[in-house]
Amino acid sequence: MPLEIDLFAIERGSITAPAGCGKTQLIAETLIAHRQSKPILVLTHTNAGVAALRARLRRAGVPNSAYRVSTIDGFSMRLIAKFPARSGHNPQILQLHQPNTDYPAIRHAAMLLLQAGHLAQPLRATYARLLVDEYQDCNVVQHAIVSGLAQVLPTCVLGDPMQAIFDFRGNRLVHWANEVQPLFPAAGELRIPWRWRLAGAENLGQWLLAIRQQLQVGQPVDLRTAPAEVRWVQLNAGTEVQQRLVAARTESPNARGSVLIIGDSINVQGRHQLTSQTPGAMAVEAVDLRDLVNFARNFNLQGANALAQLAEFASSVMTGVGAANLRTRVESLRTGRARTPPTPAEAEAVAFVGEPTPQRALLVLNALAEQPGARVYRPEVLHCCRSAMQAVAGGTADFLSAAIQARERNRHLARSIARRSVGSTLLLKGLEADVSVVLHPELMTAQNLYVALTRGARHVVVCSSNPILMPVNNG
């Protein structure tokens, strides 16, 4: 079967790839068809994205020899490390002790190294061509890095300006029409909504392609024109919270199907509360695992509030802890005033207060998670915390260092998504499920709204007071 677009015919160009239209499959088929001895270099943005792409390529039977896949930042690190004299960078930046400043310094050094033109020969000797995935997520310096590589290698960039949602905290994304296409001329657009066709929901896929055009030119989305696969939950004043909770419990139309619940990107606490109240739901975490790192930084085993800190942390990742009641019970048990014997979790908590060690803290967390009726709804955070506590108990690191190490290991894993997951558009972009539930469309830009609506392959649920969704302006 011929490729939908022949990427080998593109010397330098860009492919516009709307959500669910087979971009990853096109990359896989291109790599399968690759016959040269030199591999194709494939760059993307996140370590989780790299892991997911590798897994997809393995499933497609793509031989490892056909490609090298990396993040743009990871490739930049290896590049300047291989040519330190020419790069002239401070070697300390490769240690990533200060990621907020080290990554920009690494990108800047790689950009200058490529712009100097010294690497043309080694790059041509190593790679056949370059493909860059999710190009809309590039900031201007990453765009300059890819532009430098494109001076040497045949290059095709693939992405969708309607999914450019990482433009925050001063991270200026490259503009598709003004900056990408002048350097990488338009070479094609994917137009078949494969995600929905394969799920038997072609009407939904075609509608999403149509509203993409509307959103792109600043028009609203009218849910009254949507196909039957889209369900509008009309929110009523005073009952919005309950209605959203009910919507979050929407079942997938297929057996063992998956549901993505897309909440408010700003109100993280609100998302976690909804996750804790939704049976079977689990939170999708930001890669920085900030709550874990803050807990590790502040947890004082020898402090008077050690049990309170531990219980509060447990309450933030699982249900059924009852932090205040646990502390009261421990005090009663320790003073001999308790009328009922301790539960296993209470017994571990009493032992922890008497001997506040990392091992004891870990036993408390494990016992709380195993209580009848308890449910861990932030498993990633708990897993990394357990891993860090085990490292501390083994004497290999302090808690903060161990937590950061656990986080960095976790960052390189392909994300394992629960059958019912809760997150924001930023956290769920690139993922798909049978059903997407959009809880706060009124807070979304056109790009965020498009990303949210395109996560569900069979069914989309939208909660709003008005059937006409008017995106908010960027910025």
Language-model segments: what does each one mean?
Residues 1-475:
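The feature marks helicase ATPase cores and/or their adjacent C-terminal helical subdomains
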